[in-house]
Amino acid sequence: MRIQLIAVGSKMPSWVEQGYQQYVKRFPSDMPLSLTEIPAGKRGKNADIKRILHKEGELTMAAIPKGNRIVTLEVTGKPWDTPMLASNMQKWQMDGRDVSLLIGGPEGLAPECIAASEQKWSLSPLTLPHPLVRIIVAESLYRAWSVNTNHPYHRE
């Protein structure tokens, strides 16, 4: 199973890339984690946010390989603790499909992304900086993998 993180935004600070890569390189070859960046629309004083969100949504949906399970990360989703994420990962593996996890931009995800989602995951009721979410998701997925494989990374 391949896991694809699709995130709105590019040109992240180096600490984001370094933090994200710390976890990517730990994943086994039979479960690689990849990142697809979607350019964020220009936002300014007179920006048409609905149009920007729609364009980001189109680009996000186009980046999802056909047949992938779609999981959106959003504040209205269900909070998952580590055992729940590990359980979901096992179900995803048994499903036999690859997984695309979607992270929206400053205004969140486009309605078409949310509508296509099979699962909605809330990392926190807090508003988190989008660059930090990439690292948190990568670490959480690695931790869940370690639970499922009895790897010593996770400790109860």
Swiss-Prot record:
Complex formation: Homodimer.
Purpose: Specifically methylates the pseudouridine at position 1915 (m3Psi1915) in 23S rRNA.
Top-rank taxon: Bacteria
Main location: cytoplasm
This protein's UniProt keywords: Cytoplasm, Methyltransferase, rRNA processing, S-adenosyl-L-methionine, Transferase
The EC number(s) this enzyme carries: 2.1.1.177
An annotated Gene Ontology molecular function: rRNA (pseudouridine-N3-)-methyltransferase activity
Catalytic activity annotation: pseudouridine(1915) in 23S rRNA + S-adenosyl-L-methionine = N(3)-methylpseudouridine(1915) in 23S rRNA + S-adenosyl-L-homocysteine + H(+)
A Pfam family assignment: SPOUT_MTase
Binding-site residues, S-adenosyl-L-methionine: 73, 104, 123-128
Record's subcellular location: Cytoplasm
InterPro entries registered for this protein in UniProt: Alpha/beta_knot_MTases (IPR029028), RlmH-like (IPR003742), tRNA_m1G_MTases_N (IPR029026)
Protein name, entry field: Ribosomal RNA large subunit methyltransferase H
GO cellular component: cytoplasm
Enzyme class: transferase
Family named by the database record: Belongs to the RNA methyltransferase RlmH family.
Keyword rRNA processing carried by entry: yes
